[in-house]
């Protein structure tokens, strides 16, 4: 999809659908595109004032139940590889830009999930 901002996600009472307004793809590998979708979904959630950590945990569980552990792992690897993003967000945090603070929270969330990734992977291997 490419950018699952909350304003581009609709629910008709039965299914979730994505409104896709984009015409350009930045990642050609499907797993990387899915990983970016996860990152952007969480960033969109964290930028909202109504957001609760339980919502992010529900998204995590939803991805796991749908077999999305590899996508979550890829998202974590992407953020780790591009650690300069987190460093930049931390440096400009004092200005309280909504999107910057949200990205910083996403980076922290993924960093805190490393052990959970290992546990989930072990459970799948059983």
Regions picked out by a protein language model, each given a short descriptive name:
Residues 1-28:
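Active-site acidic catalytic loop and adjacent metal/ATP-binding pocket
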Residues 22-117:
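C-lobe/activation-segment region of protein kinase-like
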């Amino acid at each position: 999809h490419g950018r699952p901002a909350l304003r581009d996600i609709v629910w008709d009472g039965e299914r979730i659908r994505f409104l896709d307004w984009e015409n350009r793809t930045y990642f050609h590998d499907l797993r990387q595109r899915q990983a970016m979708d996860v990152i952007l979904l969480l960033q969109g959630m964290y930028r909202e004032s109504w957001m609760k950590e339980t919502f992010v945990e529900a998204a995590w569980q939803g991805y796991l139940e749908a077999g999305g552990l590899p996508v979550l792992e890829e998202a974590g690897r992407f953020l780790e590889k591009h650690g300069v993003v987190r460093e930049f967000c931390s440096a400009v945090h004092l200005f309280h830009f909504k999107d910057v603070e949200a990205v910083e929270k996403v980076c922290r969330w993924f960093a805190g999930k490393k052990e959970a990734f290992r546990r989930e992977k072990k459970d799948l291997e059983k």
